[in-house]
Design a protein with these regions (language model features):
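Regulatory and interdomain segments flanking nucleotide-handling catalytic cores
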Residues: 1-203
Length: 203
């Protein structure tokens, strides 16, 4: 990634703030390495997709160091067991970490990829993930700001408008253009698939 020193510093500050910003959804831990690369552990696997989309939204919403260029992130979600945990994510190991790594190898030109231990789940999600990725990649900064509030806090349109200083009508119009309804269906189906498998494996 070609970023100036000021942009990297600004991006680093944002990444370090992610656990706090994402806390309304669930607890997360982050490790940052190689400048703007990072790994995030999510304590509730059914919320992994929602968190990934929220991360892309907040990055796309920000102007780093005042630069007008819109940045994004390439994210690979790995769902699985954790075999070995330490205080640092960089030295922890397990199925989830390995699947996330494999996802990054397979992501190609896309910016979102999901790998699970279940082939039928992967097969179902691959097409919908490509469509969702295309939608998110088109979000403008203003759309991204509103989508972040919706994804993380699920606030009403009026509340989002009050937080961001825009009218409820503008929020409604923006959510429609950003295809919030389709994103919500995608997230709902992901949660159902992961919950079905994890509940079955716990029995």
């Amino acid at each position: 990634t070609k970023m100036t020193k000021a942009e990297r510093t600004s991006m680093l500050q944002l990444l370090q703030s992610l656990p706090e910003w994402l806390s309304p959804l669930c607890k997360t831990n982050i490790v940052i390495f190689r400048g703007d690369s990072f790994q995030l552990k999510v304590t509730e696997p059914t919320k992994a997709l929602q968190i990934a989309l929220a991360i892309r939204a907040i990055i796309r919403a920000n102007k780093f160091a005042g630069n007008n260029e819109q940045w994004d992130a390439r994210l690979a979600i790995g769902i699985g067991t954790l075999d070995y945990e330490t205080d640092s994510l960089s030295t922890s190991d397990g199925e989830a970490y390995r699947l996330s790594g494999r996802g990054l190898d397979l992501i190609g030109r896309a910016r979102l990829h999901i790998e699970t231990p279940w082939e039928e789940v992967n097969n179902e999600l691959i097409v919908s993930t490509l469509f969702a990725d295309d939608i998110v990649t088109r979000w403008t900064p203003s759309q991204s700001r509103i989508m972040f509030e919706k994804l993380v806090k699920n606030n009403s349109q009026e509340d989002i408008g009050n937080i961001l200083g825009v009218s409820r009508q503008m929020v409604s119009k923006t959510l429609k253009v950003a295809k919030d309804a389709l994103i919500s269906v995608y997230i709902k189906r992901f949660k159902e698939l992961i919950n079905e498998r994890t509940v079955w494996e716990r029995q």
